[in-house]
Curated annotation (Swiss-Prot):
CDD domains: TMR_SDR_a (cd05269). PANTHER family: PRESTALK A DIFFERENTIATION PROTEIN A, PTHR43162. Keywords: Oxidoreductase. Belongs to the NmrA-type oxidoreductase family. This is Uncharacterized oxidoreductase YesF. InterPro entries: Ergot_Alk_Oxidoreductase, NAD(P)-bd_dom_sf, NmrA-like. GO terms for molecular function: oxidoreductase activity. The keyword Oxidoreductase applies. The gene is yesF. The keyword Disulfide bond does not apply.
Length: 286
């Protein structure tokens, strides 16, 4: 029997949100996914939601006590969209908000800073700050260049990151949403080891049975590349600066948060690569 009040997931058809939704449903929770399109999860309730239209906020938030919040993607300043949403959530009685942020973005910094503060005004809150997703290697960010060129291109130099599987983020998010005692903290989430992109490329190449290399470019080159790919200039500038920060050690850390919160060891990149090798060989021949 499903619990009475729905748990709202914004970005519920995305990489992490879809994983959270499926886990909550298996645990017997009622899940409402706020999205512009209907997904494939049969037992979820879908409601039309668009950050640009505040009129879509109230129907999504009715009867909701717990929210998983993913800010609009690719927007340098999401506060004008998200703060009115949180205000409406509070008015309608939402009690707990779990927000997805990023470990490389400072708590009071650009993009998420104002949202971090707003989330903390709820009676129960958690901010998840994961390192870079392992899924970036199998989606639009890096998959095609690995397939066609055997390359991963960044401005991160030799900087290391605690790459994390989205499944481990989702497991942590579920605990933050449903644990009896609210977490009331920022969770820095990483995988079990810190790796450079060159080391990641070597692991991926070994799994795929081919040579994969990391190509390091300048921050400005990366920004131009991102703009050419369709990112707004301000957001491309911000993202390229994050890569530069990584090159100086901003992401060189490993935490035990996933294990502490979920009781499970996070997945390694070697394990992830072995399970996803087919993603990097589809268009490649010797």
């Amino acid at each position: 029997m499903m619990k009475q009040n729905p748990i709202l997931i914004t970005g519920g058809t995305g990489t992490v949100g879809s994983r959270i939704a499926s886990r909550l449903i298996k645990l017997g929770y009622r899940v409402r996914i706020a999205s512009r399109k209907k997904g494939a999860l049969a037992d979820a309730e879908y409601v039309y939601f668009n950050w640009k239209y505040a009129s879509s906020f109230t129907p999504a938030l009715e009867q909701v006590k717990q929210i998983y919040l993913v800010a609009p993607v690719g927007v340098f300043d999401p506060a004008p969209y998200v703060l009115p949403f949180l205000k409406e959530a509070k008015r309608l009685g939402a009690k707990r908000v779990v927000m997805q942020s990023a470990s490389v973005v400072s708590e009071n910094g650009p993009v998420f800073g104002a949202l971090h503060q707003a989330v903390r005004e709820f009676p129960e809150w958690t901010v998840l700050r994961p390192s870079y997703f392992m899924q970036n290697f199998i989606n639009v960010q890096h998959r095609m260049s690995i397939q066609t060129e055997g390359r991963i291109t960044t401005a991160s130099g030799e900087g290391k990151l605690g790459f994390i599987d989205a499944d481990d983020i989702a497991e942590t998010a579920v605990r933050a949403l449903i644990d009896d005692v609210p977490h009331q903290t920022h969770h820095i989430l990483t995988g079990p080891e810190a790796l450079s992109y060159a080391e990641a490329a070597e692991i991926i190449g070994a799994a795929a049975g081919r040579r994969v290399e990391h190509v390091s470019i300048s921050r400005s080159e990366l920004q131009h590349k991102m703009e050419a790919g369709g990112l707004p200039a301000d957001y491309a500038h911000f993202m390229a600066k994050l890569d530069e920060a990584i090159s100086h050690g901003a992401e060189h850390r490993v935490t035990d948060t996933v294990k502490r919160v979920t009781g499970k060891e996070p997945r390694s990149l070697s394990e992830f690569a072995a399970a996803h090798a087919a993603y990097w060989t589809s268009f490649w021949t010797e």
